[in-house]
């Protein structure tokens, strides 16, 4: 069975289908998710907290994501696998960001990369997609910004922050 593609995910969205995504960091969880017909798997930087025991995602390196994502892609056939871009790997330096995203695609075999941030990362997303790298954006509660927020805080409760989330999603 072929791996799902970005076009498959877009069709699911266009058809109004509810899309399930689970996080997987290892062979066991990836196989269980695939057996349960979960169409999307995220190899997220939360592995820093869940697997490595850190109190945030900040210490996670690109090499950690590549290692875990390669395991997930190796043991699954169908799920669309999303690889997280850890803290400071998707920066204002577009060339470095392209290099990091390309490593995730080439070395780990992910279907797409995930970046945290809002409208300010639009130029980065444009550069990545023009280079042929599919991107999934993560807005709202962004763990890589936990230090800036002073901890994990719900976003969008106040009018101004809710409006900013809408702008970011656009």
Describe each model-derived feature in a short phrase.
Residues 2-170:
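Alpha/beta enzyme core
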């Amino acid at each position: 069975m072929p791996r799902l593609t970005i076009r498959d995910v877009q069709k699911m969205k266009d058809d109004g289908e509810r899309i399930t995504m689970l996080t997987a960091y290892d062979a066991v969880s990836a196989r269980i998710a695939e057996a349960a017909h979960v169409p999307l798997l995220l190899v997220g930087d939360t592995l820093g907290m869940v697997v490595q025991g850190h109190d945030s995602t900040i210490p996670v390196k690109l090499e950690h994501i590549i290692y875990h994502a390669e395991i997930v892609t190796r043991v699954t056939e169908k799920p669309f696998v999303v690889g997280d871009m850890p803290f400071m790997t998707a920066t204002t330096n577009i060339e470095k960001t392209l290099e990091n995203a390309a490593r995730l695609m080439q070395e780990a075999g992910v279907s797409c990369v995930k970046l945290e941030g809002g409208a300010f990362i639009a130029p980065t997303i444009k550069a990545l997609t023009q280079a042929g790298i599919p991107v999934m954006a993560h807005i709202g509660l962004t763990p890589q910004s936990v230090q800036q927020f002073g901890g994990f805080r719900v976003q969008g409760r106040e009018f101004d922050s809710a409006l900013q989330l809408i702008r970011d999603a656009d």
